């Protein structure tokens, strides 16, 4: 599994066997929780399959006709199969709740980005920065049609205006919608948050390395739902300031 994912993969790829390569603390928390749960699920799967096979093979009517006819319950067995799942649920719930609350916490952000979902494109507003006309920096991001793609670009994932953000910076991402419900999701950043009309949701974002990170709207929002890709470009602070200067 690790062999097939040794190269950085910030976008979906064919025959992938694991998550995309992450670039944020949120992503690391999600993958660690997944690996933690898979450890317990493996033993649960083996135990359940073993119990079913043993019951079918050894405890059928032909092998034990009297027990099959007169045994109706076993108090010890019922106690065990109630206690063990309860303990497993506790072991699963504790780290899950911890991660859930950590993902909801936004700690002293250095900048705020507002993403507005629309049919069928995204609008981004960087209200901490203004243009030469003293207006907040904002732009729309549309999917690039297949016939206009440059060589090496990803089909149905490339956009005309990428969301450029500095790395190693605490960012507050505010999400809403201008029409129907959308969902802003970038797997390699560990973020998926609904964009609901009339409501502001917020998540914390911090990018660990430079690169391009691809995502899509993950809430069915109409006939062109598949035409709402997201591209986040992580750059150094110097390059981000240069991009701001160019787009002001």
Swiss-Prot record:
Subcellular localization: Mitochondrion inner membrane
A GO molecular-function descriptor: copper ion binding
BP GO terms, sorted: ATP synthesis coupled electron transport; mitochondrial electron transport, cytochrome c to oxygen
Reactions accelerated catalytically: 4 Fe(II)-[cytochrome c] + O2 + 8 H(+)(in) = 4 Fe(III)-[cytochrome c] + 2 H2O + 4 H(+)(out)
SUPFAM superfamilies in the cross-refs: Cupredoxins, Cytochrome c oxidase subunit II-like, transmembrane region
Main location: mitochondrion
Pfam families per the UniProt record, alphabetical: COX2, COX2_TM
Positions in the Mitochondrial matrix compartment: 58-75
Mitochondrial intermembrane topology ranges: 1-36, 101-248
Residues annotated to bind Cu cation A2: 217, 219, 221, 225
Disulphide bridges, residue numbers: none
EC annotation from Swiss-Prot or TrEMBL: 7.1.1.9
Recorded topology in the membrane: Multi-pass membrane protein
Alphabetical keyword list: Copper, Electron transport, Magnesium, Membrane, Metal-binding, Mitochondrion, Mitochondrion inner membrane, Respiratory chain, Translocase, Transmembrane, Transmembrane helix, Transport
Details of cofactor binding: Binds a dinuclear copper A center per subunit.
Cofactor: Cu cation
Residues at which Cu cation A1 binds: 182, 217, 221, 228
Ranges annotated as spanning the membrane: 37-57, 76-100
UniProt superkingdom: Eukaryota
UniProt family annotation: Belongs to the cytochrome c oxidase subunit 2 family.
Function: Component of the cytochrome c oxidase, the last enzyme in the mitochondrial electron transport chain which drives oxidative phosphorylation. The respiratory chain contains 3 multisubunit complexes succinate dehydrogenase (complex II, CII), ubiquinol-cytochrome c oxidoreductase (cytochrome b-c1 complex, complex III, CIII) and cytochrome c oxidase (complex IV, CIV), that cooperate to transfer electrons derived from NADH and succinate to molecular oxygen, creating an electrochemical gradient over the inner membrane that drives transmembrane transport and the ATP synthase.
Quaternary assembly: Component of the cytochrome c oxidase (complex IV, CIV), a multisubunit enzyme composed of a catalytic core of 3 subunits and several supernumerary subunits. The complex exists as a monomer or a dimer and forms supercomplexes (SCs) in the inner mitochondrial membrane with ubiquinol-cytochrome c oxidoreductase (cytochrome b-c1 complex, complex III, CIII).
Name this protein carries in UniProt: Cytochrome c oxidase subunit 2
Species in which this protein is naturally found: Schizosaccharomyces pombe (strain 972 / ATCC 24843) (Fission yeast)
């Amino acid at each position: 599994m690790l062999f097939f994912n040794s190269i950085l993969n910030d976008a979906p790829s064919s025959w992938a066997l694991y998550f995309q390569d992450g670039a944020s603390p949120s992503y690391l928390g999600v993958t660690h929780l997944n690996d933690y749960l898979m450890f317990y699920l493996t033993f649960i799967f083996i135990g359940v399959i073993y119990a079913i096979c043993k019951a079918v093979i050894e405890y059928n009517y032909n092998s034990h006709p009297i027990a099959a006819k007169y045994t109706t319950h076993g108090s010890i067995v019922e106690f065990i199969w109630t206690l063990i799942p309860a303990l497993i649920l506790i072991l699963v719930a504790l780290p899950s709740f911890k991660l859930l609350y950590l993902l909801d916490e936004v700690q002293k952000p250095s900048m705020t980005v507002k993403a507005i979902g629309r049919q069928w494109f995204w609008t981004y507003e960087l209200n901490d920065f203004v243009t030469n006309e003293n207006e907040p920096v904002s732009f729309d991001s549309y999917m690039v049609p297949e016939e206009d793609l440059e060589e090496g670009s990803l089909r149905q994932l490339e956009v005309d205006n990428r969301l450029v953000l500095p790395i190693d910076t605490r960012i507050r991402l505010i999400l809403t919608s201008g029409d129907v419900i959308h969902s802003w999701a970038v797997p390699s950043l560990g973020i998926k948050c609904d964009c609901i009309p009339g409501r502001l949701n917020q998540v914390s974002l911090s990018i660990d390395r430079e690169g391009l990170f691809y995502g899509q709207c993950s809430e069915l929002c109409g006939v062109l739902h598949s035409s709402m890709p997201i591209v986040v470009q992580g750059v150094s602070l110097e390059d981000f300031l240069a991009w701001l200067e160019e787009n002001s």
